[in-house]
């Protein structure tokens, strides 16, 4: 049992990333620019957030009245690797002393119904929130009965009461987390790994326009605070330091926002060149056709031709530019190969592949998207198949 607990604690520590306030602010403001009333009268639930540590709680409680929230609910997970140790109470507000009376072992639940200038100093800030919570004035601060797992009955009941979920869930549980959001028909803005786009549980939701990428930070460097002792690649730690975050921080270059809230960037047309212009000014060569599927390879999103009516294979980074009014998603070239009718590569491709010195394990029945240029073989990484929408 002891070994099991240690293993679980280690896994939790290495799966816990604390989002920066500025990243949250930029993302939420993008939805407000598109629809200033999107949060008005809504219950926001942050169900993977220690209220004492989370910048999600900090952002929404400080902007409670500006957003017009009806209620803010936050719940934390026990044990939190950083609880009571790493971050100052309510983020980096140095004017607040740490409360000695707050629960130190149990997972916590905060329910905010009202915020106001309780100390009457002329401004609303985190001091007012702290005082309101300590006096239980119109708000609730209690330990949870369980461990705060988002799958627990206790947290599911809170989820049922909410309208919009905003958080950074454990990446290792992303599939299960998203499934729960759709099971309970919730709107959401959450952080995940860019590679989640290709998950067989996630991609069909993207294809059906039930889930899409958020407005900011997709595939770029996002910095996260991590628990002391968490395993961090030294290169990522150094990159975070170069971005101004020294210490227990990591940089994730493949993180992104996932949402089903609309935003303006999603409807911004992608500027394109014609096929001839791409060949002349960018690619410097003709488009290649796949050996085993009737589509062309487009290795860079900027090279999508405006005048090609057929199917095109593009990198997954395309989804950051995806406009559902401009393009139709046909499928995922790897996870949907059988459904799409992608043919096996055949023995000639296998022979050419190994003759070229490649070490991967493939056979003639393999049906990944592939193409030749002369005798040289190419296996593009993770292609999404798209076509222009007919006007």
Language-model features: where?
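Class I S-adenosyl-L-methionine-dependent methyltransferase catalytic core
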Residues: 1-391
């Amino acid at each position: 049992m002891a070994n099991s607990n240690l293993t679980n604690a280690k896994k939790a520590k290495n799966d816990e990333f604390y989002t920066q306030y500025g990243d949250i602010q930029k993302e939420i403001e993008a939805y407000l620019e598109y629809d200033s009333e999107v949060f008005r009268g809504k219950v926001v639930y942050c169900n993977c957030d220690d209220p004492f540590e989370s910048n999600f709680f900090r952002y929404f409680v400080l902007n409670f009245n500006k957003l017009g929230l009806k209620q803010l609910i936050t719940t934390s997970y026990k044990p939190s690797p950083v609880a009571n140790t790493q971050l100052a109470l309510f983020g980096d507000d140095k004017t607040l002393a740490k409360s000695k009376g707050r629960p130190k072992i149990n997972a916590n639940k905060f329910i905010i119904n009202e915020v106001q200038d309780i100390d009457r100093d002329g401004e609303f800030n985190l001091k007012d929130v702290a005082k309101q919570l300590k006096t239980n004035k119109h708000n609730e601060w209690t330990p949870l009965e369980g461990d705060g797992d988002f799958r627990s009955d206790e947290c599911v009941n809170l989820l049922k009461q909410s309208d919009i979920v905003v958080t950074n869930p454990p990446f290792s549980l992303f599939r299960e987390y998203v499934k729960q959001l759709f099971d309970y028909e919730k709107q959401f803005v959450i952080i995940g790994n860019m590679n989640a786009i290709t998950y067989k549980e996630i991609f069909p939701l993207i294809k059906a326009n039930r889930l899409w990428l958020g407005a900011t930070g997709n595939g770029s460097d996002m910095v996260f605070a991590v628990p002391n002792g968490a395993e961090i690649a030294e290169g990522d730690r150094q990159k975070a330091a170069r971005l101004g975050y020294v210490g227990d921080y990591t940089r994730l270059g493949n993180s992104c926002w996932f949402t089903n809230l609309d935003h303006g960037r999603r409807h911004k047309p992608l500027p394109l060149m014609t096929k001839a212009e791409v060949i002349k000014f960018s690619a410097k060569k003709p488009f290649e056709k796949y050996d085993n599927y009737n589509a062309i390879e487009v290795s860079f999103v900027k090279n999508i031709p405006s005048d090609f009516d057929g199917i095109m294979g593009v990198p997954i980074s395309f989804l950051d530019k995806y406009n559902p009014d401009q393009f139709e998603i046909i499928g995922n070239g790897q996870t949907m190969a059988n459904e799409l009718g992608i043919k096996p590569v055949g023995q000639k491709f296998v022979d050419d592949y190994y003759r070229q010195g490649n070490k991967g394990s493939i056979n003639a029945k393999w049906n990944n998207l592939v193409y030749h240029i002369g005798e040289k073989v190419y296996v593009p990484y993770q292609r999404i198949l798209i076509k222009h929408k007919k006007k």
